[in-house]
Amino acid sequence: MRSRLLLPVPHLPTIRETSEELSHGAPGQEPPASPSLDDYVRCICQLAQPTSVLDKATAWSPPNRSCRPAWPREKRHQSESLEDSSPCFSSLQPTLPAPGTDNPLDWLFGKSQEQQTDRRDLPNRTGSSGHWGVHRQMGKDSGRPSEARVPEYSLGRKPGHRHQTSNLKSWTSRKPCQALASVSSSRPSSILGTLYLHLPVIHEL
């Protein structure tokens, strides 16, 4: 029963049959030439460009021409800002060796020695200020700011002379407790002095 119903239905045309009919066409006409690759690319380019956008671009073209002189002004402003900022960057860049120097390593070695000498001078300056601050604090704690001691290397005195003056002051003070305190306070100051000389100094960049 089912086979009888399917028989009177006409078969659908396949792709091969339709392509043959289109290619042959009428019996007296020649088959049309197949499009080349260039034609195919041109068609795609034309389809990719919508006409509405092109019409809007052509309509807005006159005002764009009037706005074109603004570009050179912006470029001039940018060049002036770059020229103003160039001295700041040039000061940060390291100095290059002179063209007359034969070996650049000698120049680099000389620069490193100069930096080392500058770093050695800085600890001495900071160390002297640190000694003064320590002696002032010790004098304030003991209640006798007049007895604050000066570092040895600043006045060029010998350590023995300093101990003699401290001993004389202790004998004239009429108080053995104060004499012992002055002798004990002289020892930490000398220890702190040696520590400040050997401590490394950290330079902020």
UniProtKB/Swiss-Prot annotation:
Biased composition (Basic and acidic residues): 71-80, 138-150
Domain of life: Eukaryota
Disulfide bonds: none
UniProt subcellular location: Cytoplasm
GO biological process: regulation of autophagy
InterPro entries listed in its UniProt record: DEPP (IPR020133)
Major location category of this protein: cytoplasm
Organism ancestry: Eukaryota, Metazoa, Chordata, Craniata, Vertebrata
Protein name: Protein DEPP
Nucleotide-binding recorded as keyword: no
Function in brief: May play a role in autophagy.
GO cellular component: cytoplasm; mitochondrion; peroxisome
